[in-house]
Structures are given as C-alpha cells and as structure tokens.
C-alpha cells in the first residue's frame, strides 16, 4: 500500500456584520418571516440597480488588514453564472480579479509549534437564498424558497493548499473565527449560517509535488464537522486508490448523521461560471485615507492579548487560552481586574498577580462550568464582572474561605446578588480569631487519638482528618491557613 499525504484548502464564507444587505437596504436580521426581508434588488426584478454598501467594504478591508493582506485599491465586481433555484438572478455579484485583499497569512499552533498558513484572497460577494426541505420536524416532499438571505454580504476567504491534516484545519478555523469576532466584522455563528466552510481535499504519494485529484466537500455546519469530514474523506480516497480505482473531481455532501460524504455533482471549473464584469457597478478606487483609518481601528488581537495576559498577569497558558477564546470573555476578565484594582483593600496591595491568577481561575473553572451547563455566553451571565471581583476580594482579604466562596458563588449565579450581602445575611464570615480557632483545634485533637498517633508515628497525612473535623465543627468558617498552622504547632509539641 502506498503512503499518502493529505492536502487541504479551505474556502470560508463569513456573513458580514451589517444591518442591511450588500447591494440594497433590506435587513439582514436572522429568523425573520420567510421572504419578508426582500426587495426588487435582492429578488432581481427587471431594471433594479444594485447600490454598494460601504460598511461591507470596510468590513472586508479591516479583516484583510488584520490578517496581513495587501489591499487592492482598485475595486471591481463581476457576475458569476449560477443556475440554481436559490439564485434569482441566475448569477451572483462577486469579485474575480482583483479581489479586495490579496496574499495574507494566519498563524496557528500545532503540537506547541507555530505554523503559518498562507491565504490567497478575501473577496466581497452576495449570498444566495435558502431552500427549505422541512418545516419543524416534518420533512417535505417538495422544496420551499426563502430569499431573506439573498443579497446578504459575504466575505469569502480562500487558503493556499498548505493544510495537511484535519487538526490543522480545525485550528485554522478556530483562530480565524476568534480574530473576526474580535474585529466585529462577522458574528461567525455557524448555526445561523453566518460562517460556512467548503473544504477541498486531495491526497498524493509522499514526496510527490503534483497535487492529487481535488474533491470539494460541502454542508458542514460546525468546525468539528469540518474536521470529521476531512478525516472521513481522506480515508475514502485512500481506499479508492489502494483498490486500483481512480478519483473523480467532484463535489460531495457531508452527511453528519451517517459520518460519510456522498457524491453531489461533478465539480465545476472557473470556465463554467463565465465571469464577466458587472455592468451595474462601476469600478472605483479606495483612498489611502480610507485604508489608514481602518488600520487605526484594529486593536489588540487574540494572540497578542494572550501573550500580554501571560506576561503581565502571570496566568497559565491554559487560562490565557480560555480567557482570550472570545473577545467577550477577555473583556469580562479585564473589567473584573480593573474593578479589583479600584477596590481599596490592603490585602490587594503588592499582591496583584495573585489576585489576577485567582480571578482567572474562577472564570475558567467555576463560571465556565455554569456557562457550559446553561449553554449561554458570558454576556448573559447573572454575575457581573464587578461582583466577581468583589467575591475574589473577599477571599483575598480573608473574609471568606475558598470553600465558602463556592457556596456564595452559587447564590450569586442564581439570584444576581452582591457577594457581601450573601455573606452577611448567611453569617458566612470566616473565623480568623486565633484564640477561637485554637479552642476548636484542641477539641478536635482530643477527639482524634488515632489520627494523632498516626501523625506522631510519621504519617503526616493523618493531619487531614483532624483538619476536616475542625472545619466541620466551625461549619466551614475557620480560616484553613490558621487551622493548619495551629494544628501543626500543637501536634509537634504533643
């Protein structure tokens, strides 16, 4: 059997985050009544003339600048011929040559090492409508046509064939999605069709320079679906070649429920699309000032923010990965940090890195678990960044223990109450009076002769049983550090 290597290229379509469509004033709102967001332009009535949405051009150029593209100042549009029922004009307004953005790149991390994936282009185009094959759970034996999506602005990004595994494809899409969400140029919500990916997969014998027969895969509605589709298709192609067969250049459909790809149609070539200049949209030039202004709007991107979090706040790479996984989470963390800085507490002075680490841990563990369980995002959480900062401050200044803090956190999440109020109402203030803790420790020691004997014989872990008894007697309120300190002193002197 021959040894093959995988070659993957991605075509990523991202819906541009604008209120109106790219060539008309119709709304882009998702979930509207079918065919309610339409007009004579996006349904291609005779004589209707498209008018370019400036905000759509800004979004594409801004994305290109963030991904290190060269911006082509000469902007032209073309007609790409399609004969599908969801394209009412029988052509799509798109860009052929030149695209708005040429020759960009994106860094991904694979097995701890950075790899650069070169990107051929990003161009601006309009979306098609949508064929509906079921209503609710009822499958139809006919198709319905919803043109609400027709004419919505898209930016299509095309990579070079430099991705060599499904894992690299997954990381590329995750990194791209994160950057574009940070920029605000697309919401990239795959469930709503605001980010779609077509995958071109081929294999070739190891060492061969010429690319193998390319197969395009469509219909992936999640990033993990892209990964799974590539993995399946690579194995399918290997089986075909190893059995003496030949691969066909075709478009295949990913069937997620079956975990297979299925032949859809033969793959068109560029000639089949019969591109020609769009006569209703004249070419125009982008001023240098237009590009420069967009460049100024690009602030800190995810990788740079992650590096800063690690350097300035001393947090782990794991926590930094999670905290910068979306702009909303990163903003929440820094808002909470600023709130922590502004609190006048002696316990925070000179201890900011400890506070930053503790706060990061609470967001990436406790809060993250709640968000996952409720399937919500951090923007919808009941705990404000200011209130989480207050909770962390209560731990740091010794008012409550970490264990008690989890009880307080639960109530904060359920009822949106400030932590100080919960602590006061429930009498949860930590006992830090040494004389009070000493009395409880002495009681616990006298009631734990077996654990004391084991500790004295060298089994230092036996102290855990006595600590547990102290915490039980104090209803979890005793300061754990003081408990350990006093018990060690008493036991060593026993």
Curated annotation (Swiss-Prot):
This is Aspartyl/glutamyl-tRNA(Asn/Gln) amidotransferase subunit B. Allows the formation of correctly charged Asn-tRNA(Asn) or Gln-tRNA(Gln) through the transamidation of misacylated Asp-tRNA(Asn) or Glu-tRNA(Gln) in organisms which lack either or both of asparaginyl-tRNA or glutaminyl-tRNA synthetases. The reaction takes place in the presence of glutamine and ATP through an activated phospho-Asp-tRNA(Asn) or phospho-Glu-tRNA(Gln). SMART domains: GatB_Yqey. The keyword Nucleotide-binding applies. Keywords: ATP-binding, Ligase, Nucleotide-binding, Protein biosynthesis. Coiled coil: none annotated. InterPro entries: Asn/Gln-tRNA_amidoTrfase_suB/E, Asn/Gln-tRNA_Trfase_suB/E_cat, Asn/Gln_amidotransferase, Asn/Gln_tRNA_amidoTrase-B-like, GatB, GatB_C_1, GatB_Yqey_C_2, Gln-tRNA_amidoTrfase_suB_CS. Pfam families: GatB_N (PF02934), GatB_Yqey (PF02637). Disulfide bonds: none annotated. GO terms for molecular function: asparaginyl-tRNA synthase (glutamine-hydrolyzing) activity; ATP binding; glutaminyl-tRNA synthase (glutamine-hydrolyzing) activity. Belongs to the GatB/GatE family. GatB subfamily. It comes from Endomicrobium trichonymphae. The keyword Transport does not apply. GO terms for biological process: glutaminyl-tRNAGln biosynthesis via transamidation; translation. The gene is gatB. Its EC number is 6.3.5.-. It is an enzyme of class 6 (ligase). It catalyses: L-glutamyl-tRNA(Gln) + L-glutamine + ATP + H2O = L-glutaminyl-tRNA(Gln) + L-glutamate + ADP + phosphate + H(+); L-aspartyl-tRNA(Asn) + L-glutamine + ATP + H2O = L-asparaginyl-tRNA(Asn) + L-glutamate + ADP + phosphate + 2 H(+). Heterotrimer of A, B and C subunits.
